[in-house]
Regions:
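Long alpha-helical scaffolds
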Residues: 1, 5, 112, 148-152
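Short, solvent-exposed recognition patches
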Residues: 33-122, 126-127
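Generic detector of well-ordered secondary structure
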Residues: 13-16, 59, 153
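Surface-exposed amphipathic alpha-helical segments
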Residues: 128-155
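Intrinsically disordered, low-complexity repeat and linker tracts
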Residues: 29-30, 155
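Membrane-interface helical sensory segment of bacterial ECF anti-sigma factor regulators
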Residues: 1-29
Length: 155
């Protein structure tokens, strides 16, 4: 188990394919898109990471639990918390849905469970063999979905 808070990051480069028509042939290749590049805190060992974190949230903790669960927690000046969690296929989690508004939506073509309560909003879905979750303090449904939809594979 590793847990620490650090402001150091590494930059994830994002590329877009280009195609240029030259008449008899079309050249294709990759071009770096610096506008889409984003930072990932050092110590993050998961395969996925959100490219969008709401303004004002700063990393307070990065954890690796037995190589099965990867967590990163953020906090803003209002003491509101945001957590992104990635679990391997060998891990399992429970979501408190008692007295919650629960519905299903789609994220990246996968079914996502959304649970909204007065004190907690959770969005959980899978990407390949990983279960991903975004957890927000309070009824932060719109922000939680925006963070979830921004998650991309980085490894």
């Amino acid at each position: 188990t590793t847990a620490f808070a650090s402001s150091e990051t590494f930059r994830v480069r994002v590329f877009s394919m280009f195609a240029e028509d030259h008449g008899q042939y079309t050249a294709i290749g990759l071009r770096e898109d610096e506008q889409k590049a984003f930072d990932v805190p050092n110590g993050w060992e998961g395969m996925y990471y959100p490219t969008y974190i709401p303004d004002g949230f700063e990393v307070i903790n990065v954890e690796n639990l037995s190589e099965q669960i990867f967590l990163i927690s953020f906090e803003n000046k209002n003491n509101e918390y945001l957590t992104f969690e990635e679990m391997t296929e060998d891990a399992e989690s429970n979501i408190d849905t008692e007295n919650a508004q629960v519905y299903y939506t789609e994220i990246h073509g996968n079914t996502a469970l959304v649970s909204v309560k007065a004190d907690l909003t959770i969005v959980s879905w899978n990407e390949q063999n990983r279960i991903l979750s975004v957890v927000f303090d309070g009824e932060m449904e719109e922000d939680a979905l925006k963070v979830a939809k921004s998650v991309t594979r980085i490894k």
